[in-house]
């Protein structure tokens, strides 16, 4: 008989007054039995997710880490794949990679970034996700899309979790749910 999946709870946090406070928060989240510490990926009053998640992983031994969610438009997928694989490697395989097409108009406006129509953002996201997964795989990636072109890049380091860290997809529209289902 198959065992049901264990139900897990995570905590989302975004800021701390100091590095010591952030590490203490991560240890407290772990001590309370939560499975994962998540962070949003926005430009406002919060810590930058990648270094903050690494600090949280370094301060704990079992706590999983992740973003809810990395906005595809804020980082080229080659950069995000490298950062995600590095987080997974240095944390001993504890990354949960949350990604999405972007939704917070105010972030785009404040950063002077174009907020493209949903179809364009979702098309770009789907390509970005394919690039990330391709870079996590063994061998060189050759990818030709409308938004991204990758020529013979072998993504290094590779994540510990194989074939890749768990991927969470943020979104509620039918097309995003279809992408998540694949």
Language-model-detected regions and their locations in the chain:
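Active-site-adjacent structural elements that line small-molecule/cofactor binding pockets in enzymes
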Residues: 1-182
């Amino acid at each position: 008989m198959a065992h049901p999946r264990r139900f897990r709870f995570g905590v989302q946090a975004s800021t701390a007054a100091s590095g010591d406070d952030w590490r203490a928060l991560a240890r407290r989240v772990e001590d309370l039995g939560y499975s994962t510490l998540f962070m949003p990926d926005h430009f406002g009053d919060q810590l930058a997710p990648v270094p903050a998640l690494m600090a949280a992983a370094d301060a704990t031994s079992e706590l999983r880490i992740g973003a809810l969610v990395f906005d595809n438009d804020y980082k080229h997928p080659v950069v995000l794949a490298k950062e995600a694989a590095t987080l997974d490697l240095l944390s001993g395989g504890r990354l949960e990679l949350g990604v999405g097409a972007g939704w917070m108009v105010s972030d785009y406006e404040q950063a002077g970034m174009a907020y493209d129509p949903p179809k364009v953002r979702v098309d770009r996201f789907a390509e970005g996700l394919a690039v990330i997964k391709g870079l996590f795989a063994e061998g060189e990636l050759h990818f030709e899309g409308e938004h991204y072109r990758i020529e013979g890049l072998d993504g290094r380091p590779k994540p510990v979790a194989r074939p890749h860290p768990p991927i969470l997809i943020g979104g509620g529209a039918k097309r995003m749910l279809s992408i998540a289902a694949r």
